[in-house]
Amino acid sequence: MRPASCLCRAITLLVSLVGLLVLPTRAQAVPAFASQTGQQCAACHVGGNWPALTPWGRFFKLTAYTAGQSAWEGGKFNHLPLGVWGQFGATWVNDDANASPPSASGAFRPKEVTVHLAGKLTEFAGVFLEYTNGYTAGSSPAWAWGSDVMDLRMAHFFQLAGQEVLLGVTANDGPGIQDVWNTSWAWSFPFYGSPIAPGPAASPLPFGLANFVAGFGAYAWVNRSVYAELSFYRTALGGFRFMSWGVPWSQAGGAVYVDGYNPYWRLTYNTDLGAGNLMVGTVGMKTKAYPDNLRPQGRTDDYTDIGFDAQYQYLTDAHKFTVRASYLRETQKFNASFPLGSSSAPDGDITVINLNGAYWRGNAWGLSLGYVTTTGSANNALYGFSTTPDTNNWVLELDYMLTQNIKLMAQYNAYTRFNGASSGASGNNSLYLNAFIAY
């Protein structure tokens, strides 16, 4: 780790740079959804911290982003349904050699710039689209535009057999993108990570399918308590290429090519408990994927993911507490990769457990602590090392909302085990300072 004086100077520089951005524009503009609803970001996000959703934020998303006025309604233009989101910061890796690239450790740089189209289309339909110019370590070019988050919805309440039922449909670009709980694959803590810090070699396949697939599904929310969804995901090519814009499909290993339509299911139960709310749920997906995205033919590798999760929130104006837990196990059948030699075994497994909690003091600052453990079977050909990919990671994060449009974040990742090894694991520890600006 660099000397403490360097970190102090870095924090001072980060605050100073953000301060220059705040002074002339002080929250004169707000993100598109806030403009549409007339509410502050904290109405939908705990402490104003995107993407952690409040009960109202989950309701807003499930009802297809239709609360409030559309951009054009009542014969007049109401607001611009566009916004810009940017991040910049710096990462210090305990052993600079583990950064990607090593020279990037300690250097301030932009992380990404995102343009989003978000808002109500009709009384029953809404959209959330993001296109991002982001930095990817080791890629050529390192900076590139591409589709990011896509979620198009239609939803409407019905009375069925004396029960209130919200029925909806969704089209999105990744399993979990449509989910409203922060235990899901797409929106789990830590919500943000450094583009250059090292990470575990193994992760379940659905964690990496976003932007490679196009999904279509239907859901029902009964009495605002029981939620059930069934969706199917296919490769985002042909008429769905707009969902994978920017993906290097012609580059070996640049994408994941799935076979046919792959089922994803979600079932949750939630209830209000005074100022608190509780959710328990399960999620799963079965996926057939080709080992070579340039040759989508022949046999596939088969993945089955089954997970369970829970979340509890206690939210008041002054104090906000959230506790989350998730468990996911993936079983793998390398029907194609094993005969080709790109897998050392005919089958395998990965298990990920994520436990985390957060406290927010009003809408000003938040402190989060998480523990993520990944275990799995050894696979030298797949991971590039002979040991198991077992990794244990502690995450400590401090967030400060300078305004509802600007957030400062300091995140520390501490590894006690990294890709099967305890010795030297701390060399992958990292400190990540980041600033978020959304208008």
Where are these regions (language model features)?
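Outer membrane beta-barrel
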Residues: A52-T54, L80-V93, S100-G238, D259-A275, ...
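Detector for outer-membrane/organellar transmembrane beta-barrel domains
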Residues: N277-L396, Y400
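Transmembrane beta-barrel architecture of outer membranes
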Residues: P110-E112, A144-D151, E164-L166, V213-G215, ...
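The canonical Cys-X-X-Cys-His
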Residues: G38-G48
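Outer-membrane beta-barrel "beta-signal"
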Residues: Q40, S426-Y439
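Sequence/structural signature of outer-membrane beta-barrel proteins
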Residues: G89-D96, T132-S139, Q159, G174-Q178, ...
